Regions:
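Long, low-complexity intrinsically disordered regions enriched in Ser/Thr/Asp/Glu with frequent Gly/Pro
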Residues: 1-4
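Phosphate/nucleotide-binding beta-alpha loop and adjacent structural elements of enzyme active sites
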Residues: 6, 10-296
Length: 296
């Protein structure tokens, strides 16, 4: 009887509708975007573009519903080859460039290569946390970084900018003012602890993006770890997250860019109220009635 009450409740029906609506809206908005010549294809810039075994690329749902291309930056050659071999079905361009501030650094290649960084580990932090204490650097090489402004100066609009570069997001963003001026959504790994020596934290990245016209929307993922002393299941320390920022609509002059933001909001993040808010602004500027899609 209790189970039946839950399954037949209005609350469950409403939640089921919330799960189904993003798929339908994604398809319809994707078709709308494909129909606007100036917006298609959408452009994803992926800084730190290697594939991870246990998860899809965060922007994969976006590419499933509209025409798009991915420009990726991944310094490890075997990871570039691996992704190119596995993703022949998308418009993918992978580059070996290390994105940063244009200066030379020592690139630290680690035993888990997804943690490789232009910065060395901060052993005082890493050794204290159960999930991180086995990390170590196995090789180093001297590299020269390139700024995002230089690397994609020919890209007229970045619809989705994703950064996962292990403590180096702040220098990359601080030297990307031109790119940020034409970027609609930023999805950025940020840290709350200095896992790497000399790195900036979320408290540094957040005001930088706000100063460039972005609004913090949410964390799409939060990662916590247990202290080495245990117990391992007691994951008490928040270490890092993936932060989501949308360009403030009142700073966007092209209304179709707001339609793209709404598409990303619902397709990648399932944020229906944000999407409807943005669609309302798009309709107001363009004289359309896409907001009615939310009433179906």
């Amino acid at each position: 009887s209790v189970l039946g009450g839950f399954l037949l409740s209005n609350e469950r029906r409403e939640k089921q509708a919330l799960r189904e609506q993003p798929r339908e809206l994604s398809q319809k908005l994707g078709q709308a975007i494909d129909g606007i010549a100036s917006t298609s294809p959408l452009t994803v810039v992926d800084v730190g573009a290697q594939s991870l075994e246990d998860e899809d690329h965060v922007y994969a749902p976006m590419l499933a519903h509209t025409k798009g291309r991915v420009i990726g930056f991944e310094p490890l050659e075997h990871r570039r080859r691996e992704r190119e071999a596995n993703e022949r079905n998308i418009d993918l361009s992978l580059r070996p460039t290390l994105i940063g501030d244009g200066r030379s650094y020592t690139f630290h290649i680690n035993n888990i290569d997804a943690t490789s960084s232009l910065l060395p580990f901060n052993r005082d932090i890493v050794d204290d946390l159960n999930d991180h204490r086995t990390l170590e650097t196995v090789a180093t090489e001297t590299v020269v970084t390139t700024t995002l402004d230089e690397a994609i100066s020919d890209v007229s609009r970045v619809d989705f900018l994703k950064l996962d570069i292990q403590g180096f997001a702040y220098p990359a963003l601080a030297n990307a003012a031109s790119v940020l001026s034409r970027t609609l959504v930023v999805h950025c790994e940020v840290e709350f602890l200095p896992f790497y020596l000399g790195q900036a934290l979320f408290s540094d990245v957040d005001p930088l993006l706000r100063a460039n016209g972005f609004r913090f929307v949410d964390f799409s993922r939060l990662s916590r770890s247990a202290f080495r002393s245990g117990p391992p299941a007691s994951r008490d320390q928040l270490g890092w997250a993936e932060a989501v920022y949308f360009k403030e609509a009142d700073t966007i002059t092209n209304p179709s860019w707001i339609l793209i933001q709404a598409f990303i909001a619902v397709t990648i993040y399932g944020k229906l109220s944000l999407a409807r808010h943005l669609i309302g602004e798009y309709d107001r500027r363009s004289g359309t009635s896409y907001e009615s899609l939310f009433d179906d």
